[in-house]
Amino acid sequence: MRRIPGPAWVIVAVLVVWLVAGCENLRLVQTAEEAKDFHPKSIGVLPADAGIYKDAEGKIDGIITDVLVRTKWFQTVVGGEDIRKQIEANPELKKSVDVYLAKLRELNFSDPELCKVISELCGIEAILIPTVDVWEYTMLGGDKIARVGISMKLVDTKTGKTIWRAGHLVSEEYRFLKPELTSMGRSMVRKMIDRMPH
């Protein structure tokens, strides 16, 4: 029997690791048929709905904005913090965003008229709507766990159509040193944005 040389084992090991890492899928990805013709030049990130996870507020907005800017896919990226300031300064925008999100959350209806108002007031062609599903340190069966879960929807402001949505959850077990939730979130956002139409 012929023996396989050491360097060949290294190459095989690297390929296996690369294939396994590349196969990590997101928990949820849905892309509309219209995505193939959707190429916005500008995108706005609505402030993330962090729900009970107040520690994630602001952090996730900054992470998403930074990842979008680094892709260089868009001429303009209006981040969650910038849109939050615009909402505070403009009552019409505040009302439009509040009503739009309420309809989206309660009726699963993306109102095209409100999308157009938000688009005009913010100067954007697409809206990214992030939600923090989980952002915590917890105990499960006696194990210490760090968990981060994020969902996103990409909406075409011309039609109000949800072009893409994705969601993912990662957990990391630890003993002494807590993993940084922000680092876990950044890694997850990169994976999600990589799958987003642009």
Predicted regions and their residues:
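Charge-dense, low-complexity intrinsically disordered segments
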Residues: 10, 51-55, 175, 179, ...
